[in-house]
Amino acid sequence: MNDRHNDLRVEGLAKSYGPEAPVLRGLDLTVPGGALAAVLGPSGCGKTTLLRVVAGFLRADAGTVALGGRTLVGPGVQLPPERRRIGIVPQEGALFPHLSVARNVAFGLTGTDRDERRRRTEEMLDLVGLSGYGDRMPHELSGGQQQRVALARALAPRPGLVLLDEPFNALDSALRAGIRADVRAALRATGATALLVTHDQQEALSTADVVAVVRQGRIAQCDTPQDLYRRPADPWVAGFVGDAVLLPGTVGDGGATATTPLGTVALTAPADPGRTGTLVLRPEQLRLTDAGAAVRATVTDVCFYGHDAKVTVTVEGLDTPVDVRVTGPLPVGPGRRTGIHVTGEATLHP
């Protein structure tokens, strides 16, 4: 990480598909060299358009894109894709079906002699865990293996940036976690900067060094996965990157806590006494207690997931139900009364 030669800087990027269809609206994004950044957002937010502009497949209406200080997009500048030092891993690998695995990986190694191409190809296949697969054809591989080959092909020419366009979508859920870990390890080993476009919150939080949440063509928040989850910029971000519990609250006299329908809650940052707003919590911060507790709730639903369960309760003073994550034996069922209290801190938003 922190290889400045591969820093990605996007400033003021704008792109519209007609006068009534703006997609990117002055988007700014900085990815440190060697980092894996996830671009996360709902369908239609502009994340794929961002990737295509960075790759050179689309022209921006305004703004700049620079990689390692070299301008790729800007006033009077539009480098063609083949001159950008960018590798691409598309959604389903898109391997050349008539070429062997080795020839797919070596496809971009132009200007090198045969021995160097062979050495680099073997190195990349070993890196992605496919040593010995060079003579196979794409149709002989599983979906996960095809994605590994696509990654090896993207990394072989030593790009400064690798773009991954929802590369795990077509894989079975049982395979995704393992493939994600392998892709992350391969990118780290080469030191390439990477941009992963995804709509999968779990994928973004578990894979990336930084996560940029896109909303309506702008970055709503760009942060580490931990800070994004624990200190969301606003209630919308909180709800998009995970289950959120939103509570009305009033800051207490000391400025360090707020009074809510679930009791007194500590704040992540001091606030002016008397200020009102919305507190953001996560379901795992809530605990079910004895029914005689100060704050009481009624269980309306229980969803069991194996590793944990989601217990939905109603609380007096709240218009919407509250979800509580419970591990271990379930102490309550629908219709039962229970106590509830908050652990940890909450962020306060206007």
Predicted regions and their residues:
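A short, flexible loop at the N-terminus of ABC-type nucleotide-binding domains that lies
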Residues: 1-10, 14-26, 75-79, 113
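ABC ATPase nucleotide-binding domains
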Residues: 85-87, 91, 95-236
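Non-catalytic connector elements of ABC transporters
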Residues: 244, 254-350
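Helix-to-loop junction immediately C-terminal to a conserved catalytic motif
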Residues: 55
